[in-house]
């Protein structure tokens, strides 16, 4: 048997290399930021069918909905950071995996990289992001724990001028806007039907914050499709023990293919006093249309509660109202109402929903809620032939 002898110098050298590698690995781990969400939702809708059917209560729909997302941020050097987002869900729209429990079996999820970009912070008070990233504007929804996300490849720069003013400009040479949900699922229609994702998108946003108030204004243009702008204001005030959070926003989207100029304005306020809370909001669209963004749930749209969504509905007004109480530190109970009043030139019908919700926050990063209510749409199947639905939902979400 041959015995190999190692000199003291060799042993010290090998130990130094191992220690250096361990130090590099430790430093690399320290420089990695990890966050994300995991969400599960069960929907159960028992719906009446057309009055032409002998049994009007045979319609029903139930589904399991899943989505998991992990965000990774790695410091490359003092000026550069790499960001990525990995999603397990539906690759088509970076959304959730939906499994109909009545017509489909269990399936595995798509796992894909939805974001991969670099931040450059070498310019004072400025962040420049290059690569595939979320498109963050009032017209889009860039992140959602359970829903589609707007992404694209481009360059975004944000600069801060003191604590009050910031400016952001972005340009994308391609997006996934063709797979976004820009209108209500029960009535109304999106006018962004010819978007294929290859169109370039550019926007500029200015924000001013002062004395508890924040004012923002954004202009965006999707090549050969639309020009849009949105102006919003919100506040946060405390008067003794009363907390008030009012807001208002006006948005307009002008289609290039037609003379239609879609508008939607909305205003609302959240109030909290002790264990009690209340929320009320009102919105309205014009006769030409209510499509004012690529996603119905974006800031420019109005989708405050559950199935009643004003986005994409023309010549209509909506009201959303909630009262709630914090029963314990972990349990909140609320009663919610939503209603849409459609005008004579609307592309939809009157609709309303009322539901109760019990939310339970087991820990800082684990929450769940259960909902049960009633949803109705007038003349859904024809004249005097309404949709009536008993709706239920269970939602569980973990954040890290």
Where are these regions (language model features)?
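Beta-barrel outer-membrane channel/assembly domains of diderm bacteria
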Residues: 2-135, 155-162, 208-209, 234-242, ...
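Intrinsically disordered, low-complexity acidic/polar segments
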Residues: 45-47, 81, 93, 139, ...
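Surface-exposed coil loops of outer-membrane beta-barrel proteins
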Residues: 50, 95-114, 123-223, 291-314, ...
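Solvent-exposed loop/turn segments connecting transmembrane beta-strands
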Residues: 62, 142-149, 174-177, 196-200, ...
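Detector for outer-membrane/organellar transmembrane beta-barrel domains
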Residues: 209-211, 230-343
């Amino acid at each position: 048997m041959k015995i190999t002898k190692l000199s003291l110098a060799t042993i010290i050298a090998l130990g130094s290399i191992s220690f250096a590698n361990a130090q590099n690995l430790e430093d690399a781990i320290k420089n990695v930021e990890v966050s994300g969400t995991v969400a599960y939702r069960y929907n159960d809708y028992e719906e009446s069918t057309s009055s032409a059917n002998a049994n009007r209560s045979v319609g029903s729909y139930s589904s399991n909905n899943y989505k998991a997302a992990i965000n990774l941020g790695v410091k490359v050097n003092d000026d550069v950071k790499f960001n990525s987002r990995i999603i397990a869900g539906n690759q088509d729209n970076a959304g959730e995996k939906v499994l109909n429990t009545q017509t489909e079996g269990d399936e595995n999820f798509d796992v894909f990289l939805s974001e991969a970009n670099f931040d450059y912070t070498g310019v004072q008070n400025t962040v420049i992001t290059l690569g595939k990233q979320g498109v963050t504007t009032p017209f889009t929804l860039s992140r959602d724990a359970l829903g589609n996300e707007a992404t694209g490849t481009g360059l975004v720069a944000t600069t801060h001028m003191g604590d009050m003013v910031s400016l952001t400009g972005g340009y994308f040479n391609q997006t996934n806007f063709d797979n976004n949900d820009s209108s209500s699922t029960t009535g109304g229609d999106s006018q962004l039907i010819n978007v294929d994702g290859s169109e370039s998108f550019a926007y500029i946003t200015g924000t001013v914050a002062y004395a508890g108030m924040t004012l923002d204004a954004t202009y965006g243009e999707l090549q050969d499709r639309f020009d849009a702008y949105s102006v919003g204001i919100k506040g946060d005030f405390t008067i003794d023990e009363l907390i008030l959070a009012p807001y208002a926003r006006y948005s307009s989207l002008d289609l290039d293919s037609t003379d239609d100029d879609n508008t939607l304005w909305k205003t609302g306020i959240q109030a909290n006093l002790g264990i009690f809370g209340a929320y009320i909001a009102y919105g309205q669209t014009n006769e030409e249309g209510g499509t004012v963004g690529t996603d119905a749930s974006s800031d420019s749209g109005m989708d405050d509660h559950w199935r009643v969504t004003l986005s994409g509905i023309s010549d209509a007004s909506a009201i959303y109202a909630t009262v709630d109480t914090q029963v314990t530190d972990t349990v909140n109970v609320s009663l919610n109402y939503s209603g849409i009043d459609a005008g004579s030139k609307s592309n939809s019908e009157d609709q309303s929903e009322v539901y109760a919700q019990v939310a339970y926050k087991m820990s800082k990063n684990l929450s769940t809620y259960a909902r049960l209510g009633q949803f109705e749409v007038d003349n859904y199947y024809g004249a005097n032939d309404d949709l009536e639905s008993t709706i239920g939902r269970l939602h569980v979400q973990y954040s890290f």
